[in-house]
Regions:
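Transmembrane beta-barrel strands of outer-membrane/channel proteins
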Residues: 2-6, 50-56, 115-121, 185-189, ...
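Extracellular/periplasm-exposed beta-strand and loop segments of Gram-negative cell-envelope proteins
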Residues: 8-27, 57-95, 122-166, 192-210
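Outer-membrane beta-barrel transmembrane strands
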Residues: 91-106, 162-168, 172-174, 183
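A hydrophobic membrane-anchoring alpha-helix module
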Residues: 174-176, 180-192
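Outer-membrane beta-barrel strand-turn architecture
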Residues: 38-42, 105-109, 177-179, 219
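Outer-membrane beta-barrel "beta-signal"
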Residues: 175-180, 207-219
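Outer-membrane beta-barrel architecture
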Residues: 31-37, 100-102, 172, 214-216
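Repeated loop/turn-to-beta-strand initiation elements of outer-membrane beta-barrel proteins
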Residues: 44-48, 110-113, 179-185
Length: 219
């Protein structure tokens, strides 16, 4: 199976620190999977699906925030940590190897539904971006004010703080369009924070939520 992933990595619900989402670009995120199904019983209505999936989970967003936990990198390489108010651009580009374990139900000869869990290992990671048109309060919301205006930006990079193992739930449908060709749609919803437990710059958990759509060859 091959397809694309469309979605984002987001806190749920949106915290008060995020005042608005100003731009969103899912970018091109590809997935490739091989799986097998074992039908059970005489009627073969129920089955179990497992396999291996290579996938990327990407997005680029712009948001307006207030008192948003941040650690920026200055032009001199020094890091400033505190609360940011202003614009934030975020780029997420993560590559995983994923093993789903799903229960399947055959609705008819062409259509089947499936749901279950998945576990993923992060192979290549990026969570970075920059801040713009705003100010940083060093330390906390009452700290010294550092302004960024007139096109000035400061970068940040939390890639090394991403968790290597992830898990979540998955549900979707497969439709057999032709004898050997099927199309599919799967929703995957992460259930653990993408950041490591000891990472506290961003003060809320973030979860990957993506829709995979594509086609597959059935043997």
């Amino acid at each position: 199976r091959a397809g694309v992933s469309i979605g984002g990595t987001s806190p749920l619900p949106l915290p008060v620190e995020i005042r608005s989402i100003d731009a969103y670009n899912p970018t091109l995120a590809l997935m490739l999977e091989g799986n097998a199904i074992k039908w059970l019983g005489k009627t073969k209505k129920w089955g179990v699906i497992t396999g291996v999936r290579l996938e990327t989970k990407n997005m680029i967003t712009k948001a307006t925030v207030k008192n948003y936990g941040m650690e920026i990198i200055g032009n001199d390489g020094n890091r400033l940590k505190g609360n940011w108010t202003g614009g934030v651009k975020t780029k997420v580009r993560n590559a995983y190897i994923t093993v789903p374990v799903l229960g399947a139900y055959k609705i008819n000869s062409r259509l089947r539904a499936k749901a279950g869990i998945y576990v993923s290992y992060l192979m290549d990671e990026e969570f970075s971006g920059h801040v713009y048109e705003g100010y940083l309060r060093e330390g906390d919301s009452t700290g010294e004010k550092v302004n960024f205006s007139d096109g000035a930006i400061a970068t940040y990079d939390f890639s090394d703080d991403l968790r290597k193992f992830a898990w979540g739930v998955q549900a979707g449908v497969d439709w057999r369009a032709f004898k050997h060709l099927s199309v599919f749609a799967d929703l995957t919803w992460g259930l653990n924070d993408i950041f490591k437990k000891d990472f506290n710059t961003i003060t809320f958990a973030m979860y990957p939520i993506y829709l995979n759509v594509g086609f597959g060859y059935a043997f």
